[in-house]
Amino acid sequence: QGSGSACRSLWGGFVEWRLGDDDDGTDSHGVPLAEADHWDVAMVVAVVHDGPKPVGSTEGMERSRLTSPYYERWVETAAADVDAARQAIASRDLQQLGEVMEASTFKMHATMHTSRPPLLYWHPGTVALLHEVQAIRADGMGAWSTMDAGPQVKVLCSANDARSVAERLRPHAVRVDVLRPGGPAALESP
């Protein structure tokens, strides 16, 4: 079983992961929103831990669904967050996309933190990186954090700011990578 979000990797550029109608999510799918050259943005990925997660994403989300008092509210707000993100991508509004993305990330982690037993994927480096992203913003540079169910912090910023953001994050991470929107999935021969 793979990640449902992998459907976003089939197309290049900006892709929305849409729910399907099936309760088990097997008919979820990716829908292209814009080509890779639509917007000159970057995602700076700060890796703080290379090992496996203590609880896998599927098991963790099921635990959150069943036990977190915040899970339903997170789900209820997801459609509005996706709409705002879609609009931000269409209009190339980095601040709007960053704000909605970061808020959604913290809502998701709130559901995990309030699960029983709690799911705490964060490491000390994770918290240091989240503080550093806020400091970068306070210094006037557009940078917003996002995370999946794990300890790594990804930072959305303009492509022009990516190198500076990466340098600010480097002291708190074991590795920092700068990624840009790419093309569609392709098979390559060895």
Residue ranges of predicted features:
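Gly/Ser-rich oxyanion-binding loop with an adjacent helix/lid
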Residues: 1-40
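C-terminal nucleotide
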Residues: 33-190
